[in-house]
Amino acid sequence: MQALDVLLNRVSVPRLIEPAPTQAQREVLFGAAMRAPDHGHLQPWRFLTVEGAAREQMGELLAEAAKLQDAEVTEAAIDKARNGPLRAPLVVVVIARVQDHVKYPKSEQLLAAGCAAHGILLAAYAQGIGAVWRTGDLAYSPHVAKGLGLAEGEEVIAFLYLGTPLKEPRVAEKVDLAQFVCAWPGKA
């Protein structure tokens, strides 16, 4: 698959089934992530892979976080949190490892980690792997951070769900670029 085809046609694939990406495919996914633009070459990211029974444990962690976040949370919302990680055979947790740095601010490091996540999504599409970015507010819970073993200065920025597409992915819609791009006229 050509690079421009991947860049112009990647879409989210929300319905995923087994099998999960193979080890060889994962090496490509994470290799692509490592090519993310990174001012200062800090590599301010790391990844956790969650699969098999660990997905159920992650679901319990998210359900606990939902209860802690809102004392009046509904059972439906708790169940949704609990079942979230079961929606794909592989969940990749993308973690930003932000460092105090005089030259490279936190915002740039978070953007670099986001680019690493995007690299995984692009590499997934290029290999025919279904993928979708499904993070949600529970990802930012201190309870989830602790349960996932995050260190100080680390934060979850993405839950990427990966697997085999249940059906043929939709075709990317054309975008009116004029709605997003314009020339700056400079000062008058």
Task: Locate predicted features.
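N-terminal amphipathic, basic helical "cap/leader" segment at the start of enzyme domains
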Residues: M1-R87, G186-A188
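C-terminal helix-cap and adjacent tail motif
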Residues: A3-S12, V156-A188
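Small-aliphatic-rich amphipathic alpha-helix that forms the alpha element of a beta-alpha
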Residues: A33, V92, V98-G147
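Acidic-glycine-rich active-site phosphate/pyrophosphate-binding loop
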Residues: K67, L86-Q99
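Short, electropositive alpha-helical surface patch
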Residues: V144-I157
